[in-house]
Amino acid sequence: MRSRSNSGVRLDGYARLVHQTILCHQNPVTGLLPASYDQKDAWVRDNVYSILAVWGLGLAYRKNADRDEDKAKAYELEQSVVKLMRGLLHCMIRQVDKVESFKYSQSTKDSLHAKYNTKTCATVVGDDQWGHLQLDATSVYLLFLAQMTASGLHIIHSLDEVNFIQNLVFYIEAAYKTADFGIWERGDKTNQGISELNASSVGMAKAALEALDELDLFGVKGGPQSVIHVLADEVQHCQSILNSLLPRASTSKEVDASLLSVVSFPAFAVEDSHLVELTKQEIITKLQGRYGCCRFLRDGYKTPKEDPNRLYYEPAELKLFENIECEWPLFWTYFILDGIFSGNVEQVQEYREALDAVLIKGKNGVPLLPELYSVPPDRVDEEYQNPHTVDRVPMGKLPHMWGQSLYILGSLMAEGFLAPGEIDPLNRRFSTVPKPDVVVQVSILAETEEIKAILKDKGIDVETIAEVYPIRVQPARILSHIYSSLGCNSRMKLSGRPYRLMGVLGTSKLYDIRKTIFTFTPQFIDQQQFYLALDNQMIVEMLRTDLSYLCSRWRMTGQPTITFPISHTMLDEDGTSLNSSILAALRKMQDGYFGGARIQTGKLSEFLTTSCCTHLSFMDPGPEGKLYSEDYDEDYEDDLDSGNWMDSYDSTSNARCGDEVARYLDRLLAHTVPHPKLAPTSRKGGLDRFRAAVQTTCDLMSLVAKAKELHIQNVHMYLPTKLFQPSRPSLNLLDSPESPQDSQVPSVHVEVHLPRDQSGEVDFQSLVSQLKETSSLQEQADILYMLYSMKGPDWNTELYEEGGATVRELLSELYVKVGEIRHWGLIRYISGILRKKVEALDEACTDLLSYQKHLTVGLPPEPREKTISAPLPYEALTKLIDEASEGDMSISTLTQEIMVYLAMYMRTQPGLFAEMFRLRIGLIIQVMATELAHSLRCSAEEATEGLMNLSPSAMKNLLHHILSGKEFGVERSVRPTDSNVSPAISIHEIGAVGATKTERTGIMQLKSEIKQVEFRRLSVSMESQTSGGHPSGVDLMSPSFLSPAACIAASSGSFPTVCDHQTSKDSRQGQWQRRRRLDGALNRVPIGFYQKVWKILQKCHGLSVEGFVLPSSTTREMTPGEIKFSVHVESVLNRVPQPEYRQLLVEAILVLTMLADIEIHSIGSIIAVEKIVHIANDLFLQEQKTLGADDTMLAKDPASGICTLLYDSAPSGRFGTMTYLSKAAATYVQEFLPHSLCAMQ
């Protein structure tokens, strides 16, 4: 008989340990593990982690088998794992209705339960009696389902189960925007049942999605139908949000030890090695103690100060748990595993020794890992005074099976029984390894032969869409519809993937659908409902963004391939040449670089071997040879009106396979194109219809008169509040380019001269006749507007003999017409009438919220300014925006547009939003108009009109300059660049010498430019280089510096007006006021501002801002680094409606925070910040008067009472705001200051 090897003996020892601590508790029927002896429920997360030691031991036996007996042990252990995983599957599959509902609702009431009955797999508590929504638990199950399947275990047994797992993928793919209760089941750390976005859930979901992608759940015995499909864009959404959260864990937890499972084993979800190390160091620095790590700061679980009879904490109670949080040895097991996977032998040795010291020896010397160590109740005060000095006692479960399992797994790996690749067969541990450079393949296609000829004349040789056959080209929305059939199962009542827009990663692959290759055009070209794709410059910008995104986020095998079609809308207005922006982009791509990406242009057929190609096996024919299974026909036949056209498919011919699929997609394409005479709109009647009609082209006086004729009472109740002034100007009536001879016809308001019949009523037929005769697009829009408001959208004008035409249809036709000539003011105007909404609006809103940015729409104060703090359904979101816009459809449309741009920048340049936690879109729009008025030296009316007439690309560019803080200027010309009707307004970056880029390079000189642009603001570096903090060459005492710009002093409106007598000496006037207005509107504060506010609150009873108090008790609930605290402070500051005044209050608070570093216990009760600002204002006025300034120069802002010059003063220097604010703060709190500090007075 062969003797047992040493390794075999050691493995037998681990087998005894596993049986005595884990497997002895496994239910023989369900395979589930109870939480402990006294807690018989089975938690999903704990079960998965607890079985890992069994799985690892089985792999070790399989690898190190000395005898057949060892192989039998390996099989037994592996089947114990399979039994548990299938037990959890049975628990969840019983709740299949919840999975179906949650895909659409993301509601906590529709979530899978977090724990089940160990004996029956049934639920144990009600939907609303536990924090069930824990996406990390479902994700960790799916992650190890993938890893175990890849290691050779057979867990999934039927296609029904495959479909269920596919729907679990849809369940977790929205983790990046779903607030849940997290790994500790508490949600917000106040333990009041408030869900929040958790980095641990997002990271684990990202790992599970990546692990399952293209995995065959039947293993080597599977086929195409058992493969799981994951959309790469959803994975990257999770990655973006995860990177934006880390090293924070959530809005209420600035750090959490559970993040170890995200940055290291098992998820390995973070690709940035620096961020991985930063997160680990945060955990070690802030959470590690002598017995393990705290879960998070101020965690009250099982501490002596926790009241076990009360489920929730009081917010101020959290301070009691500081420094006495329980320490969990569990997290040291993660550090051991992390050291093994990263090859850090010293780390492994250090934490193994530390863990051995806290293990408890059980019966027969069995090492047991306790759940946690707590401070003894009689030594709490001692621990408060000297943290980490008191000896703690073990509490909770013994052993803690989750920790016990990871301890055993770490020991097996540390002793060489398992290699990292065996426990991680999907190679997730290489996530931080640098990826090879990405070359984006771009295939340029011409829509027609004519466009191909035009491109050839420019030296660009392309194919037409017809010439790439047999490769099929389809728009992105078709791919969304195709994926909506993925996971369908009528027997389980699973509908498949919810319809969502397709991202650029999804459209940059080729797809094999029944042996036919399909390629899909980018989503941004396929904008059906909104007008962004009408702007060729915007198309170029979105293409540049997508290319850059692909280079940084592409992780799949093969190179990304973008199919870029050139359509007739990308031609110039004469249709004989290509738009200059499009042509320039094509030339750059041909040169090999565009948008920071390496580009390879070529034919689609040349890219077949190098592209990433996905086989959509779920599109393969069913058992009877049909294109789809019966499930899909039932779900989508009615929606697509497909009839029986696909029932006669004959599967014997591969050629006919491709043709049949093509016919199906063509049919689908036809049904997804909106009918040209059925543009989306909403019927309005009565007063609502009238209110909708009060818009930019309406004369208010004539509307009042017309309202009397319509017998509408209290008409002023329905007139919208204007954005910038009491009465919004009407847009200029600009004639159609087809009739230049009419260009001198004066602009008229149609409603002023409404034709009347003999009885005095409005003669609508005459109005229709006017509509037919006029060639002015503006007049056509005005007339249709009046018909829309007075007769309704479905009124038949009988304009055409055959069938007539409704108002809605005519507006849609006009929309197309103005779109062709790029009249952006009218495009937005008609888009507002027709209630056209941006398709990705709700996704844009959700993206912003997922980055922990709250949104407000409308202008302050509340309740006019509406706050969006959680994702909303599309209809609810558009309704809220309409309400905040107070009936102004143009503002409503612009708000949606700005929201989309903000989301674009958030995804690509999140650094623009540093230290901003609330994006106030109403104020941003107002500031954009103000900047136009200031830069162009024009009136409010002209600025408003100019803003509405900006092209989408120019609007996005202006927004970027405002967000980035770059120097920029604006030029206006009567010679337009892209339209015969819209005035051109271009935004240029300012160079070091103060000229615009175009002037500096001499590319173009606009003879008709109105005025030289001026700087947006002076850079801090420029200011610091000058004496006293003021720009060199500026006389501080000169009227041009001390007084407001003459135009501001003389103007009674919201914006400065043109002043001809201004000189170049005045060019810097208003710079600091503009900067404060911008920073205040954007909620921009200095780095570390909120942490400093937290410190000052500890030394006073609170800060008062215009009557709203930020109490010191806030610090008892929240820690300095919490996003929740920053949002709370920001919400108090946002009570101030004037942005520049708000920013001055921020500067005053900054001065106060300097007092926090002084060794003083208290600096008073509640500090009124606005009083400090007003004291500083008085000091400033006194000093300026002694220097000879008169009352005209020292004009005050009527809203705040602050001198305009103080707003326009630089922060530093003798006359800087910080000087006066420091003196004012010292005056206000001098009785609490040391005597030496009062000397500054």
From Swiss-Prot:
A biological process term (GO) from this entry: positive regulation of glycogen catabolic process
Where is the segment annotated Calmodulin-binding? 811-841, 1064-1104
Q: Where is the lipid attached (S-farnesyl cysteine)?
A: C1238
Q: Name one GO cellular component term.
A: plasma membrane
Keywords (A to Z) from UniProt:
Calmodulin-binding, Carbohydrate metabolism, Cell membrane, Glycogen metabolism, Lipoprotein, Membrane, Muscle protein, Phosphoprotein, Prenylation
- Tell me how the protein is altered or processed after translation: Although the final Cys may be farnesylated, the terminal tripeptide is probably not removed, and the C-terminus is not methylated.
Q: What disease is linked with this protein in Swiss-Prot or TrEMBL?
A: Defects in Phka1 are the cause of phosphorylase kinase deficiency in I-strain mice.
> What name does this protein carry?
Phosphorylase b kinase regulatory subunit alpha, skeletal muscle isoform
Q: Which organism is it from?
A: Mus musculus (Mouse)
